């Protein structure tokens, strides 16, 4: 279920402050955040935000088509190593 339209999109205040502070500077550095729940705003376009996946911060370059989505959608938290191999083929007959 999506968020109610009357509430509007959510973004953590500390993340918004970091993005606004970057807008004043000439050099764009990576913005580190733990806020996977924040919605991507149009003002985030062109910035690189390092989103925490539970182990490390994964850099995500924000593009125009990402606006409206959550930051956590672009950084998977689980590593899939594949299903178990079938040892019947390699066994001795």
From Swiss-Prot:
PANTHER family, A to Z: RIBOSOMAL PROTEIN S19P FAMILY MEMBER (PTHR11880), SMALL RIBOSOMAL SUBUNIT PROTEIN US19M (PTHR11880:SF8)
Gene Ontology terms for molecular function: rRNA binding; structural constituent of ribosome
Function of the molecule: Protein S19 forms a complex with S13 that binds strongly to the 16S ribosomal RNA.
Pfam families: Ribosomal_S19
Coiled-coil ranges from the UniProt annotation: none
A Gene Ontology biological process term: ribosomal small subunit assembly
GO-annotated cellular components: cytoplasm; small ribosomal subunit
Entry protein name: Small ribosomal subunit protein uS19
Tree of life domain: Bacteria
Originating organism: Ligilactobacillus salivarius (strain UCC118) (Lactobacillus salivarius)
SUPFAM superfamilies referenced in this protein's UniProt entry, alphabetically: Ribosomal protein S19 (SSF54570)
Keywords from the UniProt entry: Ribonucleoprotein, Ribosomal protein, RNA-binding, rRNA-binding
Family statement: Belongs to the universal ribosomal protein uS19 family.
């Amino acid at each position: 279920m999506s968020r109610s339209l009357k509430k509007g999109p959510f973004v953590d205040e500390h993340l918004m402050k970091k993005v606004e502070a970057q807008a004043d500077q000439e050099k764009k550095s990576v913005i580190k955040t733990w806020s996977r729940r924040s919605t991507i705003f149009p003002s985030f376009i062109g910035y690189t935000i390092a989103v925490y996946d539970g182990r490390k911060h994964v850099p995500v370059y924000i593009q125009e088509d990402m606006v409206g989505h959550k930051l956590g959608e672009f950084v998977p938290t689980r590593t899939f190593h594949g299903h178990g191999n079938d040892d019947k083929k390699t066994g001795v007959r």
